[in-house]
Design a protein with these regions (language model features):
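N-terminal carbohydrate-binding/catalytic regions of secreted carbohydrate-active enzymes
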Residues: 21-26, 31, 35-38, 52
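Short catalytic/ligand-binding loop motif for oxyanion handling, primarily in non-cytosolic enzymes
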Residues: 50, 58, 167-168
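Asp-based phosphoryl-transfer active-site loop
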Residues: 37-54, 243
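Charged, low-complexity surface segments at secondary-structure and domain boundaries
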Residues: 1-8, 47, 89, 100-106
Length: 310
C-alpha cells in the first residue's frame, strides 16, 4: 500500500503491534502465516460501525415497524409497538429484547429474502443516523484502513456479527469490501416457495438457532469457515469467546479489543453486552490479562469516522 499504513492511527503500542505482527506473518521467518491460513474475523456493531445511541439494525427495525403499523391495525395494537410509537425505541426495548424480536419477526414474516435485501439497502442509502450523518459515514475509518491493509497482504476478512446476517450482508460489500458470503450472523428461518415458475426464499417468524453472540460466534466460525482464524477484533463481552477461540491457536495470533473511551468524537461505555452473562468477567479485564491488544479510540485514532459527503 502506498503511503503510511494505517494513516488514521496514532503512533503507539496498538499500531506498532498490528504492523509488527503483519510483518512477521507475511515475512519468511518465524511467525510466517501461509496464504491458506490468512483468515481474520471482525465483530460489526461497535467494532466496524458505531452502535450508539443504539444498534443500527434496531433503528432500521424501528423505522420499518412504524411504517407497518400505519397499514396493519392488528400489528399496531401490539403493546411493544405501541411503546415504540409513543415513547420511541428505548420504550419498546424496555419490554425486553425477546418481545421486540418477536414483533419484528412477525412483521417481516412472508417477506422474500430478495425483498428484504432490497429494503435494507434502500434504507441504508436514504436514511440518516440520529447524529445526522448518512449511515455509510458511521463506519470507523481506522478499521476500514485495517481491512484494506489486511487485504493487501492476502488476508480474507469475515464479519461475525450478533446482528441479522441478511441485514449486514446487504451492505457489507459497499461498506467494507467484504462479500455477503463472508458474513456470519444471527439468522431467520427461511422456506422455499414456488410462484409463477420462480423459486423464492421466504422469511418465517422464527430465528434459525440462537443469536450469534458469545459462544455461538466461535461455533459458527468453525461451521462457516472451517478453520481457526489468526486475527480477531471485537469490542464487547459478546465477542469474548470469539477472541478466546482465536487466541487459543498459534501463539502468534492477533486479538484486538476496541475500547470506547472518546466522549467528544463518539461515546464512552464499557464492553457489556445485553445478550451475555452480566456476572461474567469484563472482556477488558480478560484482554489485559491475556495479553491481547487493546485499542483506545481516544488515544490510538486520529480520526473516528470518514468525512461525510455534503
Amino acid at each position: 500500500m502506498a503511503g503510511r499504513p494505517l494513516p488514521s492511527w496514532r503512533e503507539g503500542a496498538a499500531r506498532s503491534t498490528i504492523l509488527g505482527w503483519l510483518d512477521r506473518a507475511t515475512g519468511p521467518g518465524p511467525g510466517h502465516v501461509p496464504l491458506v491460513d490468512r483468515v481474520a474475523v471482525f465483530d460489526n456493531d461497535g467494532t466496524l460501525w458505531t452502535e450508539r445511541p443504539t444498534y443500527t439494525q434496531a433503528l432500521f427495525i424501528a423505522d420499518r415497524l412504524r411504517a407497518a403499523a400505519a397499514v396493519d391495525a392488528g400489528l399496531a395494537a401490539d403493546p411493544v409497538l405501541q411503546a415504540l410509537l409513543t415513547g420511541g425505541l428505548g420504550a419498546a426495548m424496555a419490554h425486553g429484547l425477546d418481545a421486540l424480536a418477536g414483533l419484528v419477526l412477525k412483521a417481516q414474516a412472508g417477506m422474500t429474502a430478495d425483498a428484504f435485501l432490497a429494503d435494507a439497502r434502500s434504507w441504508f442509502a436514504t436514511s440518516r443516523h440520529p447524529s445526522g450523518r448518512p449511515y455509510p459515514a458511521t463506519v470507523y475509518q481506522p478499521m476500514l484502513e485495517l481491512l484494506d491493509l489486511l487485504r493487501s497482504h492476502d488476508f480474507r476478512s469475515f464479519i461475525v456479527t450478533g446482528g441479522g446476517v441478511e441485514f449486514v450482508r446487504a451492505v457489507s460489500w459497499p461498506l467494507y469490501g467484504i462479500p455477503p458470503a463472508d458474513v456470519i450472523g444471527t439468522a431467520v428461518q427461511l422456506r422455499l416457495e414456488r410462484h409463477d415458475g420462480r423459486a423464492e426464499l421466504v422469511r418465517e417468524a422464527a430465528f434459525d438457532g440462537p443469536p450469534n453472540e458469545g459462544a455461538p460466534k466461535a461455533v459458527n466460525i468453525h461451521r462457516h469457515i472451517g478453520q481457526r482464524p489468526v486475527i480477531a477484533a471485537g469490542n464487547s463481552d459478546g465477542d469474548r469467546e470469539m477472541l478466546e477461540y482465536v487466541a487459543t491457536g498459534e501463539p502468534s495470533d492477533l486479538c484486538l479489543l476496541l475500547e470506547h473511551d472518546d466522549p467528544e468524537r463518539e461515546d464512552v461505555y464499557g464492553g457489556r453486552s445485553v445478550t451475555t452473562d452480566p456476572d461474567a468477567e469484563p472482556v477488558g479485564t480478560v484482554a489485559r490479562r491475556s495479553g491481547w491488544t487493546v485499542i483506545s479510540m481516544r488515544s490510538d485514532w486520529t480520526q473516528v469516522f470518514p468525512a461525510a459527503p455534503s
